[in-house]
């Protein structure tokens, strides 16, 4: 069932920031303090019993049709992958195939789920869907163009944004999924090297990263680098309290070229690769 989210109403007097914009350290520290003070579970109490380490990959979905068109797609728009996005997802899956992936969690939205499905095919592991991982509800901004707000001028009437999901709601969802993640990790029973993959969205992922690091009692990086499509943040979490974070891992995407004309079109699972067609001719 859809989650109940807190919404807020805003009036934009300035150009709204795009989701991929870098986030300053000041904002990150403020959010980290909010999260850290709110957690009641201290995992250091379990460190003497469990010295396990596990890896968590926080993946942003591959390129979607709305990414290409420059259209805002939050929780209300269920955007599909493009053909290029599908190729990105396959390359991503191939690049992490040697990890010991226990399971994949995904947002129910198509762009995330399709990306997650490619990973599960390679990893041969279960896929779990969680509404906690959905993108931010953009309210009345859903379906609007980035180009429109980029051309917005203060002398024009203020743009009133309604039903925008609040930061508190995003933090609550991030905490909720963090509980699921750490409960899964506790089940590793002293094993190390296990990996959990989480596929979500560009606006929500920084909130999830903060929640996870707060739970792990690990300082935030000096800056959270925005996720590119089909890139991931790698977190090696030591249940004893230390974690290592690598941001925006995307070397696996090198060499992928957008297919002319078709690359930006919506991916259709019924379509067959041209290589398969050519093989039948031989």
From Swiss-Prot:
Pfam families assigned to the protein according to its UniProt record, in alphabetical order: His_Phos_1
Catalytic EC class: hydrolase
Keywords: Hydrolase, Nucleus
InterPro entries recorded: His_Pase_superF_clade-1, His_PPase_superfam, Phosphoglycerate_Mutase
Localization annotation: Nucleus
Gene Ontology terms, MF aspect: phosphatase activity
Annotated catalytic residues: 61, 135
Taxonomic superkingdom: Eukaryota
Keyword flag Mitochondrion: no
This enzyme's EC code(s): 3.1.3.-
Name of the protein: Probable phosphatase C1620.13
Organism of this sequence: Schizosaccharomyces pombe (strain 972 / ATCC 24843)
């Amino acid at each position: 069932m859809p989650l109940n989210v807190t919404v807020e109403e805003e009036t934009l007097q300035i150009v709204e920031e795009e989701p991929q914009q870098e986030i300053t350290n000041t904002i990150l520290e403020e959010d980290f303090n909010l999260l850290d003070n709110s957690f009641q579970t201290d995992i250091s109490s379990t460190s003497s019993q469990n010295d396990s380490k596990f890896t968590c990959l926080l993946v942003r979905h591959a390129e979607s049709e709305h990414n290409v068109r420059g259209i805002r797609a939050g929780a209300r728009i269920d955007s599909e992958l493009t053909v290029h996005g599908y190729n990105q997802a396959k390359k991503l899956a191939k690049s992490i195939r040697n990890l010991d992936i226990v399971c994949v969690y995904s947002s129910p939205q198509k762009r995330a789920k399709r990306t997650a499905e490619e990973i599960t095919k390679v990893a041969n592991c279960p896929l779990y869907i969680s509404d906690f991982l959905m993108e931010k509800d953009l309210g009345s901004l859903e379906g609007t163009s980035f180009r429109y707000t980029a051309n917005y001028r203060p002398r024009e009437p203020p743009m009133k944004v309604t039903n925008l999901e609040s930061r508190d709601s995003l933090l609550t969802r991030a905490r909720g999924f963090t509980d699921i993640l750490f409960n899964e990790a506790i089940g590793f029973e002293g094993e190390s090297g296990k990996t959990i993959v989480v596929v979500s969205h560009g606006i929500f992922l920084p909130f999830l990263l903060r929640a996870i690091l707060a739970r792990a009692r690990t300082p935030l990086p000096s800056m959270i680098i925005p996720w590119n499509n089909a890139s991931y943040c790698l977190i090696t979490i030591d249940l004893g309290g230390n974690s290592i974070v690598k941001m925006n891992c995307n070397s696996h995407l090198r060499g992928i070229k957008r297919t002319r004309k078709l690359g930006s079109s919506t991916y259709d699972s019924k379509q067959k690769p041209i290589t398969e067609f050519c093989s039948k001719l031989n």
